[in-house]
Amino acid sequence: MIITTEKETILGNGSKSKAFSITASPKVFKILSSDLYTNKIRAVVRELITNMIDAHALNGNPEKFIIQVPGRLDPRFVCRDFGPGMSDFDIQGDDNSPGLYNSYFSSSKAESNDFIGGFGLGSKSPFSYTDTFSITSYHKGEIRGYVAYMDGDGPQIKPTFVKEMGPDDKTGIEIVVPVEEKDFRNFAYEVSYIMRPFKDLAIINGLDREIDYFPDFDDYYGVNPERYWPDRGGLYAIYGGIVYPIDGVIRDRNWLSIRNEVNYIKFPMGSLDIAPSREALSLDDRTRKNIIERVKELSEKAFNEDVKRFKESTSPRHTYRELMKMGYSARDYMISNSVKFTTKNLSYKKMQSMFEPDSKLCNAGVVYEVNLDPRLKRIKQSHETSAVASSYRLFGINTTKINIVIDNIKNRVNIVRGLARALDDSEFNNTLNIHHNERLLFINPEVESQIDLLPDIMAMFESDEVNIHYLSEIEALVKSYIPKVVKSKAPRPKAATAFKFEIKDGRWEKRNYLRLTSEADEITGYVAYMHRSDIFSMDGTTSLCHPSMNILIRMANLIGINEFYVIRPLLQKKVKELGQCQCIFEALRDLYVDAFDDVDYDKYVGYSSSAKRYIDKIIKYPELDFMMKYFSIDEVSEEYTRLANMVSSLQGVYFNGGKDTIGHDIWTVTNLFDVLSNNASKNSDKMVAEFTKKFRIVSDFIGYRNSLSDDEVSQIAKTMKALAA
């Protein structure tokens, strides 16, 4: 890289001038080798990788260079390129002239913009991290080894061996930097960060993460991350493959910053100046001017491309959806520039009036969801509830599909239930293109106001997916799946008075029960009560804070039962009078209290935050029981394991109820468990540190996963036993 230097001559009439000089000293070498860099690990990774890229450019070698990321099996950071290599003179010079590795500001790349380097500092960057590293050169039939080290007089280089290249040896340079164990993860992160612009250039060994490689692009690359992104929002220059922030230079409002959260902009080599550390740009007047002009040019280009694309769009709905996803600033920028959209030349306000759901759509019909327990929902301009379908969710711009059913026959609830059953059958030919939990808008053909709204709905969803079926058509397809209701002579309830949950084929299934009060004796076993959407105990004192059938299933699994009932108000009094059912809340409370009483106070295992992520998994998987010795001095009892599993299963389950209620009893047990675990955690952090140090691979693997597969559990057990042997 050509480094631009500006010269300005100031004339005077004084005495003879004298040149400045720098005295070579350990202090100077320390400044140039270590103090120059703020992020020392990134400096080592960046400089050695870019040197390899330059080496391959030097002899036009398209082969991939090799990076070895340090780890427990090989604690070295290794960079091996397949460039031309270097001669002994190139590396260490002679008595009259120093080489590239034992001199500063000496570079072979300063006269060309074809290379990334140019300051003559990068090859010495390992000294910012370590006092010694090795160099091996494969050049003109010889392999020469060197060790570079720092002593009291500054950096030194010493030859270690010379031998002939073998038939399989290739020219190039190999740099080996020893790495401390505590820095393994940092080196891995920096490799994944620095390599993003260099896709398909390297073979990377030992890296435990994916690299978010940049795609191929000519001018700029915009990103709106939906997950963690290593660069904070703003503008970044990519110069010589290195990413530099340039937000501080740009003051004016620009489309790139509005359009994308993060923007990477390529700059031609030679157009910017960089600091010697290459950690930042050198923001002189020329560099600032080039940055401002480049951002302005690309911002205008990007804006014109977006405007052109929007104007050529034939779908107002898709265009409006994209504008809504852009956010307020982008929409405001376009409106302020009087942009018109689509081939219909629509304004933003016109599209807004076209696609924001009107209140009249609340009269379009009723809604059911495709599941085994379909419930009627009325359409309202409000938030979603168990009885309300929000018009914004049903018709809004982010909805890309609508299923319309012409309600031409009776029995829609059973037909929807039959459809849900059919969709569970892998052999069912789903020509309807309707899927589980999708919404069905039922339009009554005899209600003129609903039929009149059908063209408006179809116009709203132009270019999106609109499925229209007659209910009779759906019935014909799912007839064999529709549940048969055996009618009793007595009048049946209009809605389910109970729900039965039972395990079939290894999974929980829910079935509606339409029972009269006189038939309440058919219900036996474990029950919970339900009123509206609330779920509570038989005595009525305790309810779930966040009512969910899944929580009841979790409670049933803890108790160890394979069926239970949820009773609605019509049957509750009679079921209680019969006395043949047990409350599932009470059963859980009794089991929980018994499990707590079975564990002696001195048998608790410390649950510090650092140990928790390991202990939770060890308790969950019996095959890993032997590992508990690394986190607890005492042997973990079966009673403690049982209690800890119950506590873990009840995480996130909260109960309403005052003192002397089932919910309060359950809360008390959980609270006491936490207190006793915290009291036992005084040695926990120390044991975790020892485990992490001794078993780094297993620690990293197990510590950052929410769950483990059976194969992973077996592999961990096998690895631990081998390492501990």
From Swiss-Prot:
It is found in: Host cell inner membrane. The keyword Repeat applies. Coiled coil: none annotated. Induction: Expressed in the early phase of the viral replicative cycle. rIIA RNA is translationally repressed by the regA protein. Its main location: host cell. One of its GO terms (cellular component) is membrane. The keyword Membrane applies. GO terms for molecular function: DNA binding. Keywords: DNA replication, DNA-binding, Early protein, Host cell inner membrane, Host cell membrane, Host membrane, Membrane, Repeat. Residues 544-570 bind DNA. One of its GO terms (biological process) is DNA replication. Approximate repeats lie at residues 101-179, 481-559. InterPro entries: HATPase_C_sf. May play a role in viral replication since found in complexes carrying several of the enzymes synthesizing deoxyribonucleotides and associated with DNA and host membrane. May be required for maintaining membrane integrity during the process. This is Protein rIIA. It comes from Enterobacteria phage T4.
